[in-house]
Design a protein with these regions (language model features):
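Phosphate-end processing signature that detects enzymes handling 5′-triphosphorylated RNA
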Residues: 1-162
Length: 162
């Protein structure tokens, strides 16, 4: 189960310790239900290829991820998807309460480029209880879109590549 809240933001946060950075490319075989491939390249580290399935939902939804090899990723990208993949840079920051803030810059340089941030939680109750103010992020995380239709990466794919 994936339990996360999402906010639209305007850049990288200031004053938080950077844990890691990934350069990603992702594409969708299907938007409903979500069937996605993703290439995740850790800055200074390894590259992973992931096939992901997600159920419908906002705050909480089922998610199944499986590692795939590069050859299968390329075949799915070229022969099944056949469209330019979404490019993302993701930076992860450890928050004072121990949670991790993931900030994403999507399709940098394109007219449709945007930023968003997510925090994942162990339970729905923890997600509903968590407040950005508690970590000094009230000004940064002030535009929550967790349960708003059209705010998923799948919706962005459909709008820009569909």
């Amino acid at each position: 189960m994936e339990i996360e809240r999402k906010w639209m933001v305007t850049g990288w946060p200031e004053g938080l310790p950077l844990e890691e950075e990934f350069t990603m490319r992702q594409g969708y075989i299907s938007v409903q239900p979500t069937v996605r491939i993703r290439e995740e390249a850790l800055t200074g580290g390894s590259t992973d290829y992931i096939l992901c399935f997600k159920s419908a939902g906002g705050l909480a939804r089922e998610e199944i991820e499986r590692s795939i090899d590069k050859d299968l990723f390329v075949q799915l990208e070229e022969k099944i998807i056949g469209k330019p993949l979404i490019k993302k840079v993701r930076r992860s920051y450890r928050l004072p309460d121990g949670a991790v803030l993931e900030v994403n810059h999507v399709d940098e340089g394109l007219p449709t480029a945007f930023w968003y941030a997510e925090v994942e939680y162990p339970t729905v109750e923890a997600a509903l209880r968590w407040q950005p103010e508690a970590c000094g992020l009230a000004a940064y995380l002030n535009n929550e879109v967790t349960n708003q239709p059209g705010q998923s990466m799948g919706a962005y794919w459909a709008q820009t590549r569909g």
